[in-house]
Regions:
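Conserved AMP-binding/adenylate-forming
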Residues: 43-48, 61-106, 255, 259-264, ...
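AMP-binding/adenylate-forming catalytic core of the ANL superfamily
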Residues: 106, 114, 125-129, 307, ...
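Gly/Ser/Thr-rich phosphate-binding loop
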Residues: 159-164, 175-182, 305-308, 320-382, ...
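Conserved AMP-binding/adenylation subdomain of ANL enzymes
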Residues: 235-257, 265-306
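Conserved C-terminal "lid"/linker of ANL adenylate-forming enzymes
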Residues: 470, 496-499, 509-511, 533-592
Length: 592
């Protein structure tokens, strides 16, 4: 059947099912039945078939129920991307409970706030995490802690120890002190997995769970919030994204082995890195990492066909240089959370070429509230093109005040309409939220906070993010747009523009990480500063040009691997206070 998405997608993908009553468990059971002999998960040396995965989920569900977990209960899973978390998400959904996912190195302050926010009664953590969190457990709603081990599941049923596994040290020390009122159990004792599905596969499962998966929403620790996603929303997302994830299989006839560099505690990480992959029969390569260095271990260990990551984590591969063969197995990179600059893409392609590979780099645009809504294939010529809507999703460029369409080529706010929204509430409940509006066409539209435009080919361009938008004089200023202009300058590795108060009013200062060699030659550094200013004069309106350039060895990142704006601003202000008036802002690199 012809549809407006047939212009962009093959007919068999252009009309996805945009409504479903399947639970997560039902969806994964369907995939396991369809692909029984395919490998579903790889974790270290262990490979789990889809047929075995279903057995393990059924047994895990029975064990959670035996522990006392009931419909509506919340279990915190803090160990990251490993089989314990994956099995538990689907098993908890089967019995009507919810999985609250979070980063494995969450601070104690946020751990307490998040646990209380979601009213968690149970928590799965490693020995090392227990050492960090045991002292604050009594401040939370948690009553039962289950200790899991990274190394146990990394080597599977064999008893061979993989000492080089980066997180082996997190399996110690063994818990000694148990706070009063807390029950402590061990995963291997409470969840004996015998892969015997006949015992549990026909046990009843709950079909009315409106908050299957919970995520920590960025906020103050004392006022934590959670993003709640239903199974229906996640399953529709899997339908709309199927073509993106099956592209390799469509070309080769074989499922792809995909490594997600995003922790499952984030919407993009779980949805695109685990659930959507399993839903369409691909192989998920599981890896939990606490810092960027471990990314390279995972790539070398698994030799994946496809990498999935945020733009920050994927771009960190560039730092390893063109002499590396890190991408020798990789055919495709799927980037979410922002667009790569042309220089970042060029470096990735160069690294791939040095390994004798032809690399494809595509993008997925989305947000926690709507999951993913746009797809940008690798052959887009402009690095400002976010591409076109995923199948089943409507996009438009609207006036942010009136909600009406703007003329072709004019700038406005990117707005999105997707049937996923209806799973979050009624029309009245949605329109009470700040980003949702009912427009004259009768549909509920989500205002994304991104400024964009659309050309005559119905392609969407990202102009800038409204976050941190300010006005200098009467001109709207988008710091993210400044960053993009600066990063086009040769020698710039990263850039982040901050708004700083001065006696003359708000000014822009761009924090820049240059290539390493610039720190050893002051004349090179000053030449780079001049070239950045020239690029900004060429590309940006006068009000959008930074008043100064500050050079740093590195920029602080948050747990998603994304530059932390507030921390950068603090760093810039501190450097300003240390440098004499009239001197250039340059951080002194640490001594070797």
């Amino acid at each position: 059947m012809e549809s407006q998405w047939s212009v962009f997608y093959p007919e068999n993908y252009a009309n996805p099912v945009t409504d479903t009553d399947e639970t997560l468990y039902m969806r994964i059971k369907r995939a396991c039945t369809r692909y029984p002999d395919r490998i579903a998960l790889e974790y270290g040396a262990r490979k789990i078939l889809y047929s075995t995965l279903l057995s393990m989920i059924d047994e895990t569900a029975a064990s959670w129920k035996k522990l006392g977990v009931q419909k509506g209960d919340v279990v915190m899973l803090v160990m990251g991307n490993n089989p314990i978390n994956v099995l538990s998400v689907y098993a908890l959904d089967k019995i009507g409970a919810s999985a609250a996912l979070c980063v494995p190195n969450l601070s104690t302050e946020y751990f307490v706030g998040y646990a209380n926010c979601v009213n968690a009664k149970y928590c799965v953590m490693s020995c090392n995490q227990y050492l960090n969190y045991s002292s604050v457990l009594k401040e939370t709603t948690i009553k039962t802690v289950i200790i899991g081990k990274y190394r146990e599941t990394s080597v599977g049923i064999t008893k061979v120890k993989v000492l080089f596994y980066p997180l082996a040290s997190y399996d110690t020390p063994r818990p000694r002190n148990v706070p009063e009122g807390i029950t402590l159990k061990y995963w291997k004792d409470a969840f004996p997995l015998n892969n015997n599905s006949t015992t549990h596969e026909n046990s009843p499962h709950d079909r009315d769970n409106n908050r299957t998966v919970l995520y920590l929403f960025p906020s103050l620790a004392a006022a934590c919030k959670a993003t709640e996603l239903s199974a229906r929303a996640l399953n529709v997302s899997a339908n709309t994204a199927e073509m993106v994830l099956k592209a390799n299989e469509d070309l080769t006839g074989k499922p792809a082995r995909m490594l997600c560099l995003n922790e499952s505690c984030f919407t993009f990480g779980f949805t695109f890195g685990i659930h959507n992959l399993l839903s369409c029969g691909q192989t998920v390569l599981l890896f939990t990492w606490y810092n960027a260095d471990k990314i390279f271990f995972a790539i070398r260990k698994y030799k994946p066909d496809v990498l999935i990551g945020y733009n920050g984590t994927v771009a960190s591969i560039n730092k390893i240089g063109v002499s590396s063969d890190i991408l020798k197995s990789v055919d495709r990179i799927i980037v979410g959370g922002g667009l790569l600059t042309s220089s970042q893409k060029a470096m990735l392609f160069e690294i791939a070429r040095s390994s004798g590979k032809k690399l494809s780099v595509c993008s997925i645009t989305g947000c926690d509230e709507l999951l993913a809504y746009a797809y940008g294939p690798s052959d887009l010529q402009s690095d400002r093109l976010i591409g076109f809507p995923l199948p089943g999703i409507l996009m438009r460029i609207s006036d942010p005040d009136t909600g009406l369409d703007v003329p072709e080529g004019a700038e406005g706010e990117i707005t999105v309409c997707t049937l996923i929204s209806k799973f979050f509430g009624s029309d009245e409940e949605l329109t009470a939220m700040p980003n949702y509006r009912k427009l004259p066409d009768g549909r509920i539209w989500y205002f994304t906070g991104n400024i964009g435009k659309q050309d005559g080919n119905k392609m969407f361009y990202l102009v800038a993010s409204k976050s941190r938008e300010t006005r200098i004089g009467s001109y709207p200023v988008y710091p993210s747009k400044v960053d993009e202009a600066v990063q086009m300058t040769e020698g710039v590795v990263e850039a982040c523009t901050v708004i700083v108060d001065s006696p003359e009013g708000a000014v822009l200062i761009t924090a820049v990480v240059p290539s390493e060699e610039y720190f050893f030659d002051n004349s090179l550094m000053e030449d780079l500063r001049d070239r950045i200013k020239s690029e900004c004069e060429l590309m940006l309106h006068e009000a959008m040009r930074p008043s100064d350039i500050a050079f740093f060895v590195s920029l602080p990142k948050n747990s998603k691997g994304v530059i932390d704006y507030e921390a950068v601003k603090e760093k810039v202000e501190m450097l300003q206070s240390e440098v004499n008036i009239g001197e250039n802002l340059t951080e002194t690199p640490p001594a070797d």
